[in-house]
A protein has these predicted regions:
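Bacterial N-terminal signal peptides that target proteins for export
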Residues: 1-9
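Bacterial N-terminal signal peptides
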Residues: 8-18
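Short, low-complexity N-terminal intrinsically disordered segments enriched in polar/charged residues
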Residues: 21-58, 62, 155
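Hydrophobic pocket/interface hotspot
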Residues: 44, 56-57, 64, 76, ...
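Short beta-strand segments enriched in hydrophobic/aromatic residues
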Residues: 60-61, 119-121, 148
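A short gly/proline-enriched turn/hairpin at secondary-structure junctions
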Residues: 65-75, 89-94
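Surface-exposed, charged secondary-structure patches
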Residues: 81-127
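Short beta-strand edge/turn micro-motifs at domain boundaries
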Residues: 127-157
């Protein structure tokens, strides 16, 4: 139980505090649209799995939002860039670089995907399952709602 709380605080600190100083030094990439909603989702997952910060942030317009657990909402390209900067750190630095998300099932309704995925990584003791809603519009990721909880990841000892 103590180990779970330790990781909860590490992940929360990484996602909410640590990236701010990093993102100040980073130049936001140009916005890059995709031809279809499926291409937006595919680009997001491929960039996420490769921890390609430029490709991740290039998908989000200025007014984009990411809805995290407990009502936390990350709004705007800079804040989203900061979020992904923390996520893309190595595991020893509190990030999750090396995690791989694979789609189990995904349904497109309008421009929104309801996607069930499973995450695996060399540093995880077991696969982690979750679901996200990806809201696409005009070839971009307009918003995302996630069930991802870094504190629920079971890390190898």
């Amino acid at each position: 139980m103590q180990r779970r709380w330790k990781y909860r605080w590490i992940i929360l600190a990484t996602l909410s505090v640590a990236p701010y100083s990093q993102a100040d030094e980073m130049k936001l990439p140009d916005i890059r649209t995709q031809p279809t909603p499926q291409a937006v989702l595919d680009e997001h997952l491929d960039a996420l799995n490769k921890c390609d910060w430029n490709r991740l942030v290039a998908q989000y317009p200025e007014g984009a939002q990411i809805h995290l657990l407990n009502g936390t909402i990350v709004t705007g390209r800079k804040a989203i860039g900061e979020l992904f900067a923390g996520f893309c750190k190595g595991p020893k630095d509190g990030g999750l670089n090396g995690i791989n998300f694979k789609v189990v099932q995904s349904t497109l309704i309008g421009g929104t995907f309801a996607t069930h995925w499973v995450a695996t990584a060399p540093f995880l003791a077991e696969p982690y399952k979750g679901s996200d809603a990806y809201i696409t519009k005009d070839g971009l990721m307009q918003a995302m709602v996630t069930t991802f909880d870094g504190a629920a990841l079971k890390m190898k000892k």
